């Protein structure tokens, strides 16, 4: 008999995206796994933000779908394209200031739709990750008011929305207003595998899957 366990048990199979995972990424491996797990082979995935994790997102299971990145920094686009020239990236000037989040944009949908790129309406989006633009630090940063509202307008009824840095006031209040109250989606904190310094990720589940989401071990209801 063959007593070599390596010949009996097949080696673990890793997803393609895991080759591009780095501990420098601000989402935990468990959080990323949960997002990637929502992608079907034909899913369309919209990512607000561009970074060293972008090649990883572009290698999800949606091989027959599309992964699009929206980024407001031309310098950052140029930097990433040097290493990953085949990424589908669109530059966008949000024309917003996070200091005006609640005085100008909150519950003013006409202002939130300013600078909305019409091409986003041409695709049925199955998964959306809001991880940009800059919403902390410098006072002149655009904030994530618009991407959160846009996500509420273009996500499929059965689609999945994730908002990163959700502990911050803008992300929290705009998500509650436009994803939770307007769409009836229930928020769940995705906290699997988080370590110190990694920020809050909230999953806004489609109404049809809220029961299964609530029973999942990966996420905890707010």
Residue ranges of each PLM-predicted region?
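Glycine-rich phosphate-binding "P-loop"
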Residues: 10-30, 34-43, 132-140
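Structural motif
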Residues: 46, 127-131, 162
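Short, flexible/disordered intra-domain loops and linkers
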Residues: 99-108, 136-144
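Juxtamembrane luminal stem/stalk of type II transmembrane Golgi/ER carbohydrate-processing enzymes
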Residues: 1-22, 217-222
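A Trp-anchored, charged/polar loop motif used as the substrate-binding/catalytic surface
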Residues: 104-119
């Amino acid at each position: 008999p063959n007593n070599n366990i390596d010949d009996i048990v097949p080696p673990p199979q890793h997803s393609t995206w895991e080759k591009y995972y780095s501990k420098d990424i601000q989402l935990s491996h468990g959080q990323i796994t949960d997002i990637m797990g929502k992608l079907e082979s034909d899913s369309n995935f919209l990512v607000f933000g561009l970074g060293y994790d972008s090649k990883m997102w572009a290698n999800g299971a949606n091989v027959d779908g599309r992964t699009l990145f929206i980024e407001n920094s031309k310098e950052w686009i140029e930097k990433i394209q040097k290493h990953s020239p085949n990424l589908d990236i669109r530059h966008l000037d949000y024309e917003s200031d996070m200091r005006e989040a609640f005085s100008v944009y909150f519950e003013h949908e006409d202002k939130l739709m300013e600078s909305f790129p019409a091409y986003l309406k041409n695709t049925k989006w199955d998964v959306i990750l809001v991880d940009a633009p800059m919403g902390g630090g410098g006072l002149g940063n655009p904030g994530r008011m618009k991407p959160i509202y846009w996500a509420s307008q273009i996500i499929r009824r059965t689609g999945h929305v994730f908002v990163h840095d959700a502990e911050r006031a803008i992300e929290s209040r705009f998500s509650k207003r436009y994803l939770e109250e307007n769409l009836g989606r229930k928020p769940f904190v995705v906290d699997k595998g988080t370590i110190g310094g990694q920020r809050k990720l909230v999953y806004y589940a489609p109404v049809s899957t809220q029961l299964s989401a609530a029973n999942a071990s990966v996420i905890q209801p707010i």
